[in-house]
Structure formats: structure tokens, C-alpha cells
Amino acid sequence: MLDIFIDADACPVKEETFRVALRYDLRVFLVANAPLRLPPQGRVELVVVPGSFDAADDWIAERIDQGDIAVTSDIPLAKRCLDKGARVVPPNGRQFTPANIGAALASRALMQDLREMARADGTALRGNAPFSAQDRSRFLQELDTVINAVRRGR
């Protein structure tokens, strides 16, 4: 069964995901560390996982399965989901795949090292680019594409 798991605490595309899931009549697990507002319609279940920093990630990784979709920008969580045969669509719409997750993990580690070095010598590094309307549009298109691919068994 195709379910969508949202790593929800900082996800900017929750409402968009709800609308797409409603159109396809899919169940959505909104996984967060604190209560969030749910849409009035659809098959959305809020899962509040208090505790450790990675509690939401662990809940998703333990339950996601082949053919499910994760909505997350968390690269280590994306890797865990891909390892279980799930598909991963981050909010920017640039899908994580088995072919590109290694490079994403390496880039993340490099940026983490650069931030630590910059902090040590007082240098400021720019953060990620702001979330844009183009990102939102690309996310909607990619989520739709992935849902249809999973339904066709691809």
C-alpha cells in the first residue's frame, strides 16, 4: 500500500502534500515532535513523537516500506528510507535516489565540516537558499510523478 510519511517539524510543503494525497486518496503520516494542525479532510494521521532529536526520523524509518514515499530534506533519513525501498521527495522537488544519495551525504558532511571550521575562526557562512515558489512547483510535479510511478510499479 502506498503511504506518504512527512518529516513534519520544518516541512514547508505539508499543505501541498495533503492536497495531492487527498486527490489520490492516500494515507499520510504527519510525524512531528510537537502537535500540529491537521487538515479537515483526507486521511492524515498526526504522530507526535516526543523525546530525542531523531525520534521522528526513527519512527518514519522503522515504519516506511517499499512503495511508500517520504517527504523530507533530512539526508540521513532519506538514505534510511531508500534502503527500505521507499521513494524520497524533498520539499525542493529534487528526488533523492540510490544513485544520488551518496553524493548528497558526502556534500552534507563537507558542509558540516566547513561550518565547524568557520565557527572556529569566526567566519560566517551563508545558509541554504530560501524556499521558493519554483521549489514548491517542482515539489508538486515530482510528488505527482513519483506517486504515478509507484502505482505503475516502477
Curated annotation (Swiss-Prot):
It comes from the Bacteria. InterPro entries: UPF0178 (IPR003791). Disulfide bonds: none annotated. Pfam families: DUF188. Belongs to the UPF0178 family. PANTHER family: UPF0178 PROTEIN YAII. This is UPF0178 protein RC1_2062. The lineage of its organism: Bacteria, Pseudomonadati, Pseudomonadota, Alphaproteobacteria, Rhodospirillales.
